[in-house]
Amino acid sequence: MKSKTANWFETVIRYDKMQEDGMAKKVNEYYVVEAFSFGDAEEKITEEMSSYISGEFEVRNITPSTYHEIFFSENGNDDRWYKARLQYITFDEKTEKEKRTSVTYLVQASTLNGAVKNIEEAMAGTMSDYVISNISETKFLDVYVKKA
């Protein structure tokens, strides 16, 4: 399990996709790209999609993500993306109360249970106490990182 911390943008692409019956249908597809700015995100997703889509397409939306770290699976069967909210638990000795801080991650896995296992694997090296407070499958088809 590897992870990458960066500025991530969620993008939506719209284009005419050829269906099995030969008819073209307008579809929206969702992707995540690593970028420094909105312009950089648009350039990156346009570059990536131009090699997969023959014909015209448009970038419908670009949104900064709520997460800054993504856990990438090394298992080739993990083809889905899950958004997970973890709560880190700390103890405030002054007030003698438990404090929880929420952090959101994007996790690659094939199933919901697989996503939980991948989170546990990624968090195994940390000393922090945490709980998974929410996890849900996303519509993202892929994540594109900057090339070195």
PLM-predicted stretches and their roles:
Residues 50-91, 125-148:
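Short, mixed-charge low-complexity intrinsically disordered segments
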